[in-house]
Amino acid sequence: MKRNYVLMLITVIISLIFIPYSVSANEGDVDFSIQALIPENQIDKKKTYFDLKMKPEQKQDIQLQVFNSSSKKITIEMDVTFATTNQNGLIDYTISDISKADESLRIPLPEITNISNREVVLQPGQSKIVTITITMPEEEYDGVILGAVHFKRN
């Protein structure tokens, strides 16, 4: 009897290890896409994100193309956030409260950017170009100002 119990337990353990199971996740309704329109002062033009070389007090417009791939009219909200480091030491681009930022953050990206229109309304199949203005501070900055543009469907 004890031998049957041990044999059954070993069979269950082996089954759990070797029988594949599938996990799926629903991405939701991602019915729009974003493409960065890379400017001339891009450091590496092969990158699909902005990596710009800018001078003190330089003002520059960056542009992103937003495309509605759905069959419905959609409204998209935009916001700029600064990058932080999570508990694992990885870069985190989630929207954070700037008042809780680490004191070592000298130039938060949201403070040097301006989005003239934070909402974009797109008809089905329509694309629009949105513009974000970056104004560098007066003093020269030897480093990287890291952040992200968040897009959220309303």
Task: Provide a role label for each language-model segment.
Residues 2-25:
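Sec-dependent N-terminal signal peptides of Gram-positive bacterial secreted proteins and lipoproteins
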Residues 24-154:
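Long beta-sheet-rich domains in secretory-pathway and surface-associated proteins
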